[in-house]
């Protein structure tokens, strides 16, 4: 193993923030762009996003969701149509005021999200109740001028999918928004090996212009939360602001009920901080850019090794995302590079292995080395992909379960937040009480967990009896 190469990564126990940026830069995941807050998604990270797209598209198409693409620029008059919405994004809006030397008559904004653009589109597509529901999604880039930036977590430009739907009834729309947050939770477990907490945002934390916001919250290795996906029930807020109406069964005019929902390239940051170690990122095998690295040993002096490696590549590439490293660099260097870049499975083949008609399979997550007969390699890789996924998920679940703590008073909350835990408390306060907690602990209300039913207790801030529980944590 090339220890010098691995030494470039700061130990996560020593400095988690520095470890995170080291993993990104040394793992060829991203490099900084020409503007503050912008990054270049290098092939090693963009491949993750491509695999997310491929797998998530299959899921939403089963729901009859259709993909489309809307323009990037939003006129000022349009974005001002929904007051709460524009106020929520005002500090982050990037404005276009000139084209060449000509000052525009109306300011244009780079989309921070696309609710208003979808609203205008829905207006042109809906005439009768027979046109409902209309279920749409776009894969796009969005722009938000963040004050504090961090690669993948907070960027001035990032990638996401945003689904937008219009429905006939309140019940149908509300249920669809709940269905999507559950789909996100399932997707994170099934493809990213990341367990999440499903919950509802408090009033102060919900999406600007939404009636209700549902969220999935993931726990990073340092105990901080990462909001990893949201689903919003918009009610008729945008429908009435933009006159998105249809002719009902009795020929009367009715307004639609709407939802919006999205995940973004933040999930790449989640993968790093949930699964990574001091050797670099560990990519979950089902969405890994490369699932298998084939590494040759002494191939420069043994042409038969190179030939067999190429044969294996041709055999495996139809079932897995495979790359081959047949360079003349040392085996230790090639192995370390594979580890830093997070490839789940490494296959090493040298002249001694050929004599025994086998290869050595190394798991990125456990460092376990397994001798595998060449004719059994494909089935073994399928098996190991499942085992690696289950191991990553199990470890992440264990951490999440260990670091969710229940307390019943404010002093205990402060102590547990300081330890880096998710703290679940009886809480019926509002923004005022939330701000006090944030000021004194730097923790925010992550969500009202949907899958937790607690006993009636006294709120830790107001002392009133409540059945509502809220999880507080520091977050990214």
Curated annotation (Swiss-Prot):
Q: Which PROSITE patterns match?
A: AA_TRNA_LIGASE_II
Which UniProt keywords are present, listed alphabetically?
Aminoacyl-tRNA synthetase, ATP-binding, Cytoplasm, Ligase, Nucleotide-binding, Protein biosynthesis
CDD domains with a match to the protein in the record: ProRS_core_arch_euk
Recorded catalytic reaction(s): these are: tRNA(Pro) + L-proline + ATP = L-prolyl-tRNA(Pro) + AMP + diphosphate
Q: Tell me where it resides.
A: Cytoplasm
Q: Which GO terms describe its molecular function?
A: ATP binding; proline-tRNA ligase activity
Q: What is its main location?
A: cytoplasm
- Annotated EC: 6.1.1.15
Q: Which domain of life is it from?
A: Bacteria
Q: What does this protein do?
A: Catalyzes the attachment of proline to tRNA(Pro) in a two-step reaction: proline is first activated by ATP to form Pro-AMP and then transferred to the acceptor end of tRNA(Pro).
NCBIfam families in the cross-refs: proS_fam_I
Q: What is known of its domains?
A: Consists of three domains: the N-terminal catalytic domain, the anticodon-binding domain and the C-terminal extension.
Q: How does it assemble?
A: Homodimer.
Name by which UniProt lists this protein:
Proline--tRNA ligase
Species annotation: Mycoplasma mobile (strain ATCC 43663 / 163K / NCTC 11711)
